[in-house]
Amino acid sequence: MKESTVIHFPFSVRRGVWLSKYSTFRIGGPANYFKEVNSAEEAQQVIQFLYSQNYPFIIVGKGSNCLFDDQGFDGFVLYNNIQKKEFLSETTIKVYSGMSFSFLGKTLSSSGYSGLEFAVGIPGSVGGAVFMNAGIGNQDIASAIESVEAINSNGDIISYQAAELEFGYRRSRFQNSKEFILSATFRLSKSASSIQIAKDLLQNKLLSQPYQQPSAGCIFRNPPGNYAGKLIDEAGLKGLSLGGAQISSKHANFIVNNGRATSHEVKELIQIVRDKLKSQGISLEEEVRIIPYRLP
């Protein structure tokens, strides 16, 4: 569908919302259409309609792992703000996808629940964490998940068991579909040490990563048997700046926004890193989602 086509939405929408406000990178121009959903019913209605109209759209949570274009997005941005949770049993919890993943980790660990302590150091939403199979070191969301509910193109809610989620290193089935992750059910255990484990993990993250500056987290996936940040550092690129974007001097797998960075500058830095490492026989793959102004 062409952008110029007039759309009459059966629900309220906003125009010209700046995506920089919905990105931890603080980069991004205005969205053509923008809609915040706060319930499963709202999400079902919006998704079914967008698919029926074949209108281009993206789903955004806390915006912690994406780079929006300076021009914005020539389509529909569906902002997920569904933030409920409920215990299904003493050690099983269902959490809706718009909730902060780090908040969930802090809440559970401080209440004596183990299984998601690593979440305290991961910005973003529960849905985003499922989408990326977020984790730290050898811990990831796949190790604690029991099932996921998602909304398909017909607006129907479907359930996937853990074995159906195609989890891999920073991968899930949802990266190859446009299903809306609605909720995740986690298996936990009771532990008196959970709060200390969470505190230690968070402290390590704060010491090693540039959390005081806007960024999108790790830019590249770690290649097998190595660390992208270490390779970028050894290539002499740590601290390299281009305009307002800089390869962090604290952790070389982060690009930070020094207050005036553009998406073009960030993408240029990413390409510089890729080219430099490629010349050494190393191929790096982006972990950050680069969202173009117009979908292909």
Curated annotation (Swiss-Prot):
Residues 26-191 form the FAD-binding PCMH-type domain. Its EC number is 1.3.1.98. GO terms for molecular function: FAD binding; UDP-N-acetylmuramate dehydrogenase activity. GO terms for biological process: cell division; cell wall organization; peptidoglycan biosynthetic process; regulation of cell shape. GO terms for cellular component: cytosol. Its cofactor is FAD. It is found in: Cytoplasm. Pfam families: FAD_binding_4 (PF01565), MurB_C (PF02873). The keyword NADP applies. Pathway: Cell wall biogenesis; peptidoglycan biosynthesis. The active site is at 170, 218 (proton donor), 287. Keywords: Cell cycle, Cell division, Cell shape, Cell wall biogenesis/degradation, Cytoplasm, FAD, Flavoprotein, NADP, Oxidoreductase, Peptidoglycan synthesis. It catalyses: UDP-N-acetyl-alpha-D-muramate + NADP(+) = UDP-N-acetyl-3-O-(1-carboxyvinyl)-alpha-D-glucosamine + NADPH + H(+). Disulfide bonds: none annotated. Cell wall formation. Belongs to the MurB family. This is UDP-N-acetylenolpyruvoylglucosamine reductase.
